[in-house]
């Protein structure tokens, strides 16, 4: 049966990203948010929100939901109005469309006919429908009706790591497989007006943005037709952090997606991340966390700061995560793939010897509901100039 399996590890062969055109500038967002939600009378809460935005280290975000949508659906700005139908009517259309845009960019970079795509993985926490976003994305792209699809709903911010793990398993166990893995989230699912009794809501309104990312994963790249690996996916793992139940969560209610984010999340991640690293890198003989490159989901500034401090990391280890957070906010599952894309582009622009900032080995981390940690040990490839 070995002839049915690929030889060697799976690699990321192409990356594509996409965002809605509408841009929200963070320094203007408190005024915008309280104006469109008709909450300008809540002056003290607005000042609290302004401080949250100022501390977020986010410069701008992309957002599908604009004022025209809010005028057409005025109930969306109410704090607890029954608006799930209106939200889903938008998102079941827009999530596959934005995902398709990211896929098209990945396929273009890959340079191969889309008929070679054998599997499609799609994850989103923004919407749920049957047939799913995977089906609609495949139709929009014109993929083969026999493409093997996997749809994963409600993973949240660790989903970028999950799609890589599953894509790796598929590619390595099906010789010749080329897996298109897509993450897309649009935060119209959780946009709503402020409440004095719901400060967690304000954090979500301050940090989340819309985005989609797609990767093509395959083993045994065929260089004769121009396939080039960007990163090798060496090993994967997932764990639930101890004493973390209820710290990150999302609940679909009549008012939309209600998001939970506990203040202890940065501490929980920073206190447990080294154990994840030791388990991942002991077989390779690596114990210096400054000797690897980092592709880290930037759930928020505090998470990056706490991990950096706990592991005594150099300040440049999270430069790509901080850049993506600044330019796009937290886009849930796709964010870590934006970071991967930024790392390989910056490595090329700065003349580094590898796609991993000049380092051979690296790690990708996703953090999300559970509190779940998804990690991938990644190996860079040399850059040929």
Swiss-Prot record:
Keywords of the record: Acyltransferase, Lyase, Transferase
Pathway, per record: Secondary metabolite biosynthesis; terpenoid biosynthesis
Residue numbers annotated as active site: 157
Enzyme Commission number(s): 2.3.1.206, 4.4.1.-
Biological process per Gene Ontology, one example term: cannabinoid biosynthetic process
Record's keyword annotation contains Acyltransferase: yes
Pfam families: Chal_sti_synt_C, Chal_sti_synt_N
Distribution of this protein across tissues and organs: Expressed in bracts, flowers and young leaves. Not detected in mature leaves, roots and stems. Expressed in glandular trichomes.
Matching Gene3D superfamilies: 3.40.47.10
Alphabetical list of InterPro entries matching this protein: Chalcone/stilbene_synt_C, Chalcone/stilbene_synt_N, Chalcone/stilbene_synthase_AS, Polyketide_synthase_type-III, Thiolase-like
GO MF annotations, alphabetized: acyltransferase activity, transferring groups other than amino-acyl groups; lyase activity
Family: Belongs to the thiolase-like superfamily. Chalcone/stilbene synthases family.
PANTHER family xref list: CHALCONE SYNTHASE, HYDROXYMETHYLGLUTARYL-COA SYNTHASE
Protein name: 3,5,7-trioxododecanoyl-CoA synthase
Gene responsible for this protein: OLS
């Amino acid at each position: 049966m070995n002839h049915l399996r690929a030889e060697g590890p799976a690699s990321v062969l192409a990356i594509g990203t996409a965002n809605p055109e509408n841009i929200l500038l963070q320094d203007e967002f408190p005024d915008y948010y309280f104006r469109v939600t008709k909450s300008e009378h809540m002056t003290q809460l607005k000042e609290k929100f302004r401080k949250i935005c100022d501390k977020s280290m986010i410069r701008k975000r992309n957002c599908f939901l604009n004022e025209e949508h809010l005028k057409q659906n005025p109930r969306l700005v109410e704090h607890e109005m029954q608006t799930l139908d209106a939200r889903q009517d938008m998102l079941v259309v827009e999530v596959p469309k934005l995902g398709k845009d990211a896929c098209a960019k990945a396929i273009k970079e890959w340079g191969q006919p889309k008929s070679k795509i054998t599997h499609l993985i799609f994850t989103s926490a923004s919407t749920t429908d049957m047939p799913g976003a995977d089906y609609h994305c495949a139709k929009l792209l014109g993929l083969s009706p026999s493409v093997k699809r996997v749809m994963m709903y409600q993973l949240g911010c660790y989903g970028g790591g999950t799609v890589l793990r599953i894509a790796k398993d598929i590619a390595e166990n099906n010789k010749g497989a080329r897996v298109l893995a897509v993450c897309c989230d649009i935060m119209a699912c959780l946009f709503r007006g402020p409440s004095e009794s719901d400060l967690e809501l304000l954090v979500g309104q301050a940090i989340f943005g819309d985005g989609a990312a797609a990767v093509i994963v395959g083993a045994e790249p065929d260089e004769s037709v121009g396939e080039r690996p960007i990163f090798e996916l060496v090993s994967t793992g997932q764990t639930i952090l101890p004493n973390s139940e209820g710290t990150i969560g999302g609940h679909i209610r009549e008012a939309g997606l209600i998001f939970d984010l506990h203040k202890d999340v940065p501490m929980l991640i920073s206190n447990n991340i080294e154990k994840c690293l030791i388990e991942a890198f002991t077989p390779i003989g690596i114990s210096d966390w400054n000797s690897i490159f980092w592709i880290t989901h930037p759930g928020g500034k505090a998470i990056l700061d706490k991990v950096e401090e706990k592991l005594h990391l150099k300040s440049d280890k999270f430069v790509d995560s901080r850049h993506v957070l600044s330019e796009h906010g937290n886009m849930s599952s796709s964010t870590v793939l934006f970071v991967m894309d930024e790392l390989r582009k910056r490595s090329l622009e700065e003349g580094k010897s590898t796609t991993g900032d000049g380092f051979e080995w690296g790690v990708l981390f996703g953090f999300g509901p559970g509190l779940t940690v998804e990690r991938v040990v990644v190996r860079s490839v040399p850059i040929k100039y």
